[in-house]
């Protein structure tokens, strides 16, 4: 069971150089992803006089996020695993693939990367409007939670199938492409209803910079729940039992 492999982590893990490198990689990858993803919406809105919330704008957002995530995951994969998403990190934690301490370090790096990306967008565009995530008319908070949960389930399930599963083989090579594709497809499916976040960091940065926090909890509860379910389902059904690896207990063990 994945629960038996969940670990808090050793104190030495926080001070280990590899943890610092992984945090920097997550910060940069998330910055790249959010800057390109949110920036594409700002650019489309400027070019079309506020047309980001149109079918064409949705397609542009889907394409930009898919391409940006492909790059962000690729450049971080060999250093941090290329999570670029607190929900993915949470799914990895639930599956026993990362300790709690290291997961929290990843979260801080990802959230900071998103905030810095949004601040840079505001500065670089001369204060252009940055869109915060919100619910469309007729979409309730619980509707959005379910939507985010299902979309993030698909994302984290894809991550497990292509990047985490020890039996993935050559499939691991295309993991960043598959991950980018599922996010792009989900934006086409859910973008018109709640913005299709699937990533608490992507929602957090714009909320901090714009000060718009209405229903922000939706973009945490839905993705985290979906990630946990995906991790448990994939691990229990497809990965199954595997030997528990003792986490390092001293700095010398790393």
From Swiss-Prot:
Entry keyword Transmembrane helix: yes
Keywords of the record: Membrane, Repeat, Transmembrane, Transmembrane helix, Transport, Vacuole
Free-text comment on this protein's domains from its UniProt entry: Aquaporins contain two tandem repeats each containing three membrane-spanning domains and a pore-forming loop with the signature motif Asn-Pro-Ala (NPA).
Locations listed in the record: Vacuole membrane
Sequence motif NPA 2, residues: 199-201
Membrane topology term: Multi-pass membrane protein
Protein name as annotated: Aquaporin TIP1-2
Motif (NPA 1): 85-87
Gene from which the chain derives: TIP1-2
Transmembrane segments: 24-44, 56-76, 103-123, 144-164, 173-193, 220-240
PANTHER family, per the entry: AQUAPORIN TIP1-3, AQUAPORIN-8
Species per Swiss-Prot/TrEMBL record: Zea mays
Pfam entry (one): MIP
């Amino acid at each position: 069971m994945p629960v038996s492999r969940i670990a808090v982590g050793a104190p030495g893990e926080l001070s280990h150089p590899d943890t610092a490198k992984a945090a920097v990689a997550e910060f940069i990858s998330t910055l790249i992803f959010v800057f390109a993803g949110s920036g594409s919406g700002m650019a489309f809105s400027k070019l079309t006089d506020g047309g980001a919330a149109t079918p064409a704008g949705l397609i542009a957002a889907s394409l930009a996020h898919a391409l940006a995530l492909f790059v962000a995951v690729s450049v971080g994969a060999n250093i941090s695993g290329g999570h670029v998403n607190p929900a993915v990190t949470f799914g990895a934690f639930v599956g026993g693939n990362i300790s709690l301490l290291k997961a929290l370090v990843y979260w801080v790096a990802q959230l900071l990367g998103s905030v810095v990306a949004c601040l840079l967008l505001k500065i670089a565009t001369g204060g252009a409007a940055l869109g915060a995530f919100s619910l469309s008319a007729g979409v309730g908070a619980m509707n959005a939670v379910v939507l985010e949960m299902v979309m993030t389930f698909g994302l984290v399930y894809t991550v497990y199938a292509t990047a985490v599963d020890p039996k993935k083989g050559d499939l691991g090579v295309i993991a960043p492409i598959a991950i980018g594709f599922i996010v792009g497809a989900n934006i086409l499916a859910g973008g018109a209803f709640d913005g299709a976040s699937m990533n608490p960091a992507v929602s957090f940065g714009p909320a901090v910079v714009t000060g718009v926090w209405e229903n922000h909890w939706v973009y945490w509860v839905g993705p985290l729940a979906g990630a946990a379910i995906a991790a448990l389902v994939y691990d229990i059904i497809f990965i199954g039992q595997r030997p528990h690896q003792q986490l390092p207990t001293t700095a010398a063990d790393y």
